[in-house]
Amino acid sequence: MPAADFVYLASQSPRRAQLLEQLGVRYQRLAPAPDEDTEALEAVLGKESPVAYVKRVTRLKLDAASERAKRQGLAPAPILCSDTTVALGRSILGKPANAAEATRMLRQLSGATHRVLTAVAVQQGRRRIEALSISRVTFAPMTAAQISSYVASGEPMGKAGAYAVQGRVAMYISHISGSYSGIMGLPLHETAWLLRAAGLKI
């Protein structure tokens, strides 16, 4: 059987789709069904470290996507999953549930350096391969008014750590070390390596 010339993207994130397009990779969405509780997969377990957390969540997402592909009887092709989390020390900053939580997170990040961890996993048949990207982001001090204005924009909602690096918050980011695409949600260097290993020509 010839190798597939496309990948299933098991993500609803427009940013990840955009990044995958930068690689020139053909993809098909493998979105969760309406009855799938994807948010439950992102629950933190006890004193789980940020690295252990992001790897575990990515594996759970890949498990769910693999089962989804089987149920739908899809043609064989690599399945790509990814998860991103923001960590301040050992504290995991997930997606804020509301404006108050977004405000609290941004106060923590203001004037500090934090890590952004993105795990990527690809399944090709029974084989699974993984990679992890860790970057560091430094925020300049933000005033209460600046935080309030940013939260009011709605941009922090649905984003790990309550911000989108490619959005308005960029004016407060003083330094980045690592993978910009990884901070956005899909580290392209690691992703390209995984897809090549799965048989795609990039």
UniProtKB/Swiss-Prot annotation:
InterPro entries: ITPase-like_fam, Maf-like. The record marks 15, 84, 166 as: Important for substrate specificity. It comes from the Bacteria. Disulfide bonds: none annotated. Nucleoside triphosphate pyrophosphatase that hydrolyzes dTTP and UTP. May have a dual role in cell division arrest and in preventing the incorporation of modified nucleotides into cellular nucleic acids. Belongs to the Maf family. YhdE subfamily. This is dTTP/UTP pyrophosphatase. It comes from Polaromonas sp. (strain JS666 / ATCC BAA-500). The lineage of its organism: Bacteria, Pseudomonadati, Pseudomonadota, Betaproteobacteria, Burkholderiales.
